[in-house]
């Protein structure tokens, strides 16, 4: 049966069932859980600085999802981004340039506020790794929601509810389509975001690897060019 929301060229978003196998998703999920455990143990025994982010960190109160375990540029997930690039190019019909990954282990009560993403997230995907189900919503009209005086202002539309199972992913124009999640009612949910640029988009060359020398490096390697 034809899947709903499967035309990226038309809708600027689509759902890909079983983008990776359930076994690979579970492996990534358990790996990420263990990494969080390692971070917590090292932090508890003061083997790492509270400002260290190489094996993830708990987001600060002013970040997008506060007090939630987060990782910019997890090496395994950056490798996964490259693995999925041919599939992403097939789905979108675009030649893509990889930028970075961002992953979280969401907890009960977390909210992903309505927003649109920065330039590095032009072509994005959120991939369900495991845990409890948590829908993501997307507004298909790019004219809805905009930034005014440095603050994002939403039209508070109903949007489209997308439910992903482990291994499924939503591909979308992160810079054009508003997306969000309502308060999480489960206990834990693992997601990884993979971000690319279209090589026909002006400025993509200077943005390669999110302005880092290569993939896998932490955020402080970013440079303005």
Where are these regions (language model features)?
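Short proline/glycine-enriched turn/loop segments at secondary-structure junctions
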Residues: 181-186
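A short coil-to-beta-strand element that immediately follows conserved catalytic motifs
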Residues: 93-102
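Non-heme Fe(II)/2-oxoglutarate
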Residues: 1-92
């Amino acid at each position: 049966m034809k899947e709903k929301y499967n035309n990226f060229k038309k809708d600027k978003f689509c759902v890909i069932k079983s983008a990776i196998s359930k076994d690979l998703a579970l492996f990534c999920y358990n790996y990420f859980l263990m990494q969080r455990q390692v971070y917590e143990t090292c932090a508890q025994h003061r083997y790492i600085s509270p400002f260290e982010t190489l094996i993830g960190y708990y987001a600060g109160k002013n970040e997008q999802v506060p007090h939630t375990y987060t990782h910019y540029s997890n090496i395994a997930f950056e490798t996964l981004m490259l693995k999925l690039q041919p599939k992403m190019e097939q789905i979108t019909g675009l030649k893509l340039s990889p930028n970075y990954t961002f992953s979280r282990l969401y907890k009960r009560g977390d909210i992903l506020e309505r927003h649109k993403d920065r330039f590095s997230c032009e072509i994005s995907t959120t991939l369900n790794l495991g845990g409890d189900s948590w829908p993501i919503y997307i507004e298909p009209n790019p004219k809805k929601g905009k930034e005014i005086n440095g603050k994002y202002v939403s039209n508070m539309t109903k949007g489209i509810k997308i439910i992903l199972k482990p291994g499924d992913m939503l591909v979308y124009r992160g810079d054009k389509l508003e997306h969000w999640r309502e308060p999480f009612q489960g206990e834990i949910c693992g997601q990884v975001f993979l971000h690319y640029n279209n090589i026909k988009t002006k400025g993509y060359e200077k943005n390669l690897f999110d302005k880092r020398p290569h993939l896998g490096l932490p955020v402080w390697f970013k440079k303005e060019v």
